[in-house]
Amino acid sequence: MPVSIMNPLICRLSLVVTAAALTACANHQGLYQWGSYEDQVYAMYSSPGKSSPDEQIAKLEADGERARAQGRTPPPGHYAHLGYLYFQTGKLDQAIASFETEKVLFPESRTYMDRLIGRLRK
């Protein structure tokens, strides 16, 4: 190739490679704001009794508030787990409200959440 054609080609190619490299290095936020959700669920099953349901509720509620403040969504299961914790503490109305929120945010959970809500209302 003649030198005059090669220089613009090399320039364009280097620009494309640079743009691709910068895009790959960009900090991508995840789809959900996980907060302490995974740690809470893990601790609940791996070390039962280490953290009371009330302590877990406080942490998950704070995570939910933080996610809303950032315009993000808590992960799937967040409100279902919160509802379960409310159930454990006898707060059935709050449990149902959490299950309803899970249904709205994650429609694929509707069948399971409806079943749980139905059992709580009996």
Locate each region found by the language model:
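C-terminal motif of bacterial Sec signal peptides marking the signal peptidase cleavage site
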Residues: 21-24
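Bacterial signal peptide processing site
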Residues: 26-28
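Residue signature of alpha-solenoid helical repeat architecture, marking inter-repeat boundaries
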Residues: 31-34, 73
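Structural register within alpha-helical repeat arrays
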Residues: 81-82
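TPR/TPR-like alpha-solenoid helical repeat scaffolds
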Residues: 110-122
